[in-house]
Amino acid sequence: MNGKLPAKSFSRRKKEDKQEWEPLQNQFSAIVLVSIMLASIFSVSFATSSLFKSITIANQGRIGFLKVPITYKSEIRGVFIHEAIYSYPHNWTIIAQTLARYGIDAVFVNDFDIFHRRPDSEITTAINAFHAMGIEYHACMNGIAESYNPDTAAVNYTGGKPDPYAQCPIKVKPYVEAAIRNYIGNHSDVDGIMIDYMRTGVHYCYCDEHRAAFDQWYYENYGEHVSNWTEFYPDQPKWNIYASWRNEPVSELVKIIHDTAKSLKPDIVISEAAWSYFSDCPTYWRKWLGQDTGRWIMEGWIDMVAPMMYVEEIYGKTGETLESCIDACQKYMTGGVEGKIPLLAFTGLCTKNATNFAAHINYIRSRGLDGWIFWRYGGPGVESGGYLTDITPYLEAITMPETFKLGNIQVSASETEATITWTTTLSATSRIEYSISQLFNATWETWGNFPYWRINHIQGNILENLTYTTDHSITLTGLNSKTQYYFRVQSEGPGGTATSETLILTTK
């Protein structure tokens, strides 16, 4: 795969457009964070990392959902609304009504970055309009590759700052936390945060802070300090060592986003617009972009992932095709179909026409993905003079079977048995996967002499009832007493498959 950006690499914002953003640094005093030297990536342990999200049920309990998360739906149908919309007259109510007619259940709105946010009145109007139509509102945050601030810009290995939109992940840490606190503090009804552009470039960052942090890590792991920095520059003998380490400061930002957002709103959904995997290559994004999606999934920092599958061709095991993207993402990123977290395909205008888009959606469904997001909105409610393509012909071309939700999971356990019940909003099958061991793990592997995290599914015991019902009940027998079991429930119907996260029960 070459180093070119995919179709989602937008042009920079227009100068007049920037004036509409509210500077976050003017609203909050900087959050002072104590700088902690980055730990070695090789020290990450399965025992201490969040390989599953769990709710422990001792003996008897109930996992109730005041609000069923979108990750528990049989198919997620989203539309991305790019920041270009703010440059044109637009009506959020008309946009929401339009998308509701086509069965869209979530929008991902590009309304803030590390340093700026759209006016709160604009965001409130948008959230209210979509919520009125039963559509979730996920705020999309531009990360370190698309946030403007010359003062914290990344430094390349020659000492220059050629791109003020490319940020140093160490310098922006307090700004990232402030941005999340500010956004959720002002818009607590937001349903999710999508992390976008959380990646760096080949030549970044070599600022003093990065050099000091890397030097300390290098000393702790190799027993010596850096004596010749040239060896760690791109295409030089030790660049792979630096390239692998530089994922750590970026990953720290994702952890900050997760921890801050969840502390303010525990049920908020954190997602990522990720660089896709092409042609069975699991290291490109980590080596060349500093984007460690596998680590973020392993740690539980993101709840769902949407790789950018901006390709026109569907079939082909190699090259930039939809098939190769899905093959690689399921293989390395989620641990297979109905994997560790929901896997969505970012698609849309890249398909060129409505007929091809319908074919893409049919293929995505046939491969068992958990949904899709259309990039990007144009149509009723936006007067862009044709700049933003009307997507309604695309949406009209696809079939939209009714989707359902899964929730109200309850467990009643004895010494040797456990009965698990749940409900679905439409009739569907019943299935439970359980094991005394974790259902997913992550392994530190190499490809092309470069390391990466791979998510693996360790299949457990399966109990299944193919009878369609909305009230589901399965009893696990032959269990050990006073033992912890990992499990997840799943239901399948005409509208797709809904799967819970990995949960825990404990027998008496």
Where are these regions (language model features)?
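Secretory targeting signatures
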Residues: M1-A58
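Boundary/entry segment of secreted carbohydrate-active catalytic domains
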Residues: N59-I95, L99, A274, C350
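Active-site-adjacent "subsite" loops/lids of carbohydrate-active enzymes
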Residues: K73, Y86, I127, E136-H187
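Catalytic domains of carbohydrate-active enzymes, especially glycoside hydrolases
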Residues: H90-F115, S188-D189, I302-V305, R367-W372
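Aromatic-lined substrate-binding rim segments of carbohydrate-active enzymes
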Residues: I95-A96, F108-E146, I241-L264
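Polysaccharide-binding and catalytic clefts of secreted carbohydrate-active enzymes
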Residues: G160-I302, M308-V311, Y315
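Substrate-binding cleft of secreted/luminal carbohydrate-active enzymes
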Residues: W301-L322, C329-P401
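Short, surface-exposed linear motifs at loops/turns and structural transition points
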Residues: E402-K508
